[in-house]
């Protein structure tokens, strides 16, 4: 699930909302932001403001916070920790296999071909990759599998509309994260690799119900239907 941050956005608000959506349940939600795309000129600011928000939410040591979760099992713990190998860690990066704790982690200058950028993270690891324009961000997103969710932070409606028009995803939230799944009038689901079909509200009835086709015809006007019935006719003799 990509997250594009416009350099003209209010970064304090953007990073607080990103940190909330990414690190709730230790990143183990299907609509959590998987990575951030931003201009290189704001990467360091994004890191610092994310760190500020994380400390606001979970304190100086998230391991001691009653609100910070743990990884679901040991196998998944090892998988997520393996994604950190060879990466530049700007924050966090530590783990405790005994309690399956992984610290809120931010990665910078990430190689787009590295494993952490090739699969759903589903853990408290947030890579940041730099792009120099909205067009480059869109190109990066469209060259990959279609995500379940896509997020864009921008004060510019044209930026938001362009991102929506030129990408494909299960859902989009602009200037926030995750919350589109809480609006029951909006269908929730994926597209392509992120799954097909959707539910919520009326869409739930349509998705989980079978629309059975039924036709009842009258026993009238048989004379007009003669043309559809075959007639017994002799086979033409060979000539």
Swiss-Prot record:
Please state what class of enzyme this protein is.
oxidoreductase
Q: Which reaction does it catalyse?
A: an aldehyde + NAD(+) + H2O = a carboxylate + NADH + 2 H(+); octanal + NAD(+) + H2O = octanoate + NADH + 2 H(+)
Keywords of the record: Cytoplasm, Lipid metabolism, NADP, Oxidoreductase
Enzyme Commission number(s) from the entry = 1.2.1.5
Kinase as UniProt keyword? no
Subcellular location, record wording = Cytoplasm
Q: Which residues form the active site?
A: 30
Is ATP-binding one of the keywords?
no
Question: Which PROSITE patterns does the annotation name?
Answer: ALDEHYDE_DEHYDR_CYS
GO cellular component, alphabetical, reads: cytoplasm
Q: Which GO terms describe its molecular function?
A: 3-chloroallyl aldehyde dehydrogenase activity; aldehyde dehydrogenase (NAD+) activity
GO process annotations (BP): aldehyde metabolic process; lipid metabolic process
Tell me the InterPro entries matching this sequence.
Answer: Ald_DH/histidinol_DH, Ald_DH_C, Ald_DH_CS_CYS, Ald_DH_N, Aldehyde_DH_dom, Aldehyde_DH_NAD(P)
**In which family does this protein belong, per the annotation?**
Belongs to the aldehyde dehydrogenase family.
PANTHER family tied to this protein = ALDEHYDE DEHYDROGENASE, ALDEHYDE DEHYDROGENASE, DIMERIC NADP-PREFERRING
Q: What does this protein do?
A: ALDHs play a major role in the detoxification of alcohol-derived acetaldehyde. They are involved in the metabolism of corticosteroids, biogenic amines, neurotransmitters, and lipid peroxidation. Oxidizes medium and long chain aldehydes into non-toxic fatty acids. Preferentially oxidizes aromatic aldehyde substrates. Comprises about 50 percent of corneal epithelial soluble proteins. May play a role in preventing corneal damage caused by ultraviolet light.
How does this protein assemble? Homodimer.
What is the protein name for this chain? Aldehyde dehydrogenase, dimeric NADP-preferring
Biological source species: Bos taurus (Bovine)
């Amino acid at each position: 699930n990509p997250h594009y941050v416009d350099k003209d956005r209010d970064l304090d608000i953007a990073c607080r909302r990103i940190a909330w959506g990414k690190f709730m349940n230790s990143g183990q939600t299907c609509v959590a932001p998987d990575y951030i795309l931003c201009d290189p000129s704001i990467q360091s600011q994004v890191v610092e403001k994310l760190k500020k928000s994380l400390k606001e939410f979970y304190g100086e040591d998230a391991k001691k916070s009653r609100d910070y979760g743990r990884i679901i099992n040991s196998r998944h713990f090892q998988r997520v920790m393996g994604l950190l190998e060879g990466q530049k860690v700007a924050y966090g990066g530590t783990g405790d296999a005994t309690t399956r704790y992984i610290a809120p982690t931010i990665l910078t200058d990430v190689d787009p071909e590295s494993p952490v950028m090739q699969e759903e993270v589903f853990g408290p690891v947030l890579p940041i990759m730099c792009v120099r324009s909205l067009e480059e961000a869109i190109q990066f997103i469209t060259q990959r599998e279609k995500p379940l969710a896509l997020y864009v932070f921008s004060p510019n409606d044209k930026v938001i509309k362009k991102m929506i028009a030129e990408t494909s995803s299960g859902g989009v939230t602009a200037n926030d994260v995750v919350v589109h799944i809480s609006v029951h009038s909006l269908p929730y689901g994926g597209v392509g690799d992120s799954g097909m079909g959707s539910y919520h509200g009326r869409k739930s009835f349509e998705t989980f119900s079978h629309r059975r086709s039924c036709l009842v015809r009258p026993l009238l006007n048989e004379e007009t239907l003669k043309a559809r019935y075959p007639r017994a006719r002799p086979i033409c003799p060979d000539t």
